[in-house]
Amino acid sequence: MAAKKRVVIRNHSAEANLFARRTFITFAGIIILSLVLFSNVYNLQVSSYQKYQTRSNSNRIKLLPVAPNRGLIYDRNGVLLADNTPVYSLEVIPEQVNDIKKRLSEVSQLLDISQEKQDKLLQAMKSKRRFKPIELYSRLSDQQVALFSVSQHKFPGFFIDARLKRYYPFAELTTHSLGYVARINGRDSLALEQQGLAENYAATRNIGKRGLERYYQDILHGTIGHQEVEINNQGRIIRTLDFTPPIPGKDLTLTLDIELQMIAKRALSGKRGAIVAIDPRDGGVLAMYSNPSFDGNLFVHGISSKKYKKLLAPKSNKPLLNRALQGYPPASTIKPLLAITGLDAGVITPETEIYDPGFYQLPGIETKRRDWKKWGHGKVDLTKSLEQSCNVYYYDLAYKLGITRISQMMRKFGFGEYTGIDLHEESRAIMPSIEWKRARYNKPWYTGETLSVGIGQSYWSVTPLQLSQALSILVNKGEIKVPHLLKATTEVVINDKDASTAQTIVTEYVVDEKQPIILKDQHSWDLVLDGLHNTVQKFGATGYAAFKGSKYDAAGKTGSAQTANIEQGEEYDASQVKESKRDNAMFIAFAPYENPEIVIAVAIENVAEGGGGANAGPVARQIMDQYFGDREIISKDPRKHPHHSNDFHQKIKNTAGNH
């Protein structure tokens, strides 16, 4: 018998309840998930909007630094000494070039790029983003720029970029004064960080390394600008959103006269030495030249090790050394200042006479110190001691003064101290004293050393700059003008509201005031200055030949500094000693005698023969001839200098009708 089918009766009520429950659970889940999603959206769009907006902008918007143009440098007459010139470089964007290796080879043939450099460039491209430009060749010549420009259509992705580089048109003529700029290194970066200036140099490649470029770095550099740009996720710039232009550095106008610099270079040609010329009225440096020199442009683009080694080679005679700021034995050029010291101390008077037999001997001492004139000068007073540069007179004066009084007064004239010039490379040189020797050598001071100091020898060294400053103090009768190279700064201020209304602001250099040297009798200045006048204007005086026939009324003092020890009784013969042991020639001069406009110090190393008058004197003469030109400046009042020769008085008569 067949089985009966089982009939299932559906419970519609239960199914409805189950469906309702499932629907409710599903709907509740959707609501919960929606609430969670809405909560997250609210958190992203509202609560954390600022945070994520900032993060987004940091990925999308970049602030790129823009370097300011470096300030220019001019001489006192507006001649450009330091310029910013465009330098052209060949660059490539790799992603825009098909078969970069082939194209690079073709460009290299056109511009003569070596295979070695090509390989280095290809290697460098592997580590850089393909959409960013890569420099292939720097400092393209005008001919190379022209060659590539004609064929540029053949090389898509290759282009020429121009940027400004420092350029010194007078090269070695101004290097020791201007210095130079060179690429910022690790030490520079650390210094900028410590000074809180790193941000202002974010886009700057070069920085002042020496001279005025270094001293006035912050003034010349200017203030960084910014370019706000939008970039994509690959770092490519899409558009510029905002631009804040950089503020250029200030221009410098110097006290230097480039024409005097040219004469200084010519006068020192073939010699090692230095010249410093100062305007005593304000301390402005008119000329400062050290020979040999070097071209600062070599360092701007990065000097090769081969060229740098050449500058350091012994036969190059140390061109990197600024001899104008380095120490030399002053020799007889300091005798006028010792005379001032003796007069002020009451050790001598204008009438004080000594007898010079050709040597000086301390009581009870066998050693004889010789005068430069073998048979001596006979009776010598203050004026004659300067005219004839009598060593015996100053041996005796130094002995009477003692090293302490000498050292104290010489420091007032700036010896052994920084002058304050706006150059970091300055040396203080050495002003010896009892304390100095004890600290340096742990030895006592000897009287014989004092005698050597009396003629500008022993441990005493001075820089040509110090010597010119001391002479400036002398002609100013105690007033001290700090030597300086900066005359004025110039900046262009642009009105934010109206860029067409730019204003040029010139700020003159303010001369620092220093405590003057006050003598017990101010007439002492005139006595010594008159002696210096005679030294140049009186026939037979040591400086007469150098300025014979000049149209201006000059004064000065010669000096010949020993660089080697000469034994007792031994004669000095320049032809018999090696060059490095020969005497140095020194000369100081100023003009005109009344109301001086220029003072000069000259140092020439290891001269073959003759002294300061024969070697350094003519160099000073060339500078002064250039400075005064055709001007005739000769005093018509012989009472101001009664000791002048008949030759000088005749000169006055001959020129009297021209004034």
Which role does the model predict for each range below?
Residues 1-305, 327-329, 347-349, 355, ...:
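Periplasmic/cell-envelope proteins involved in peptidoglycan metabolism and beta-lactam response
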Residues 4-13, 82, 231-241, 280-333, ...:
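Beta-lactam-recognizing serine transpeptidase/beta-lactamase-like catalytic domain environment
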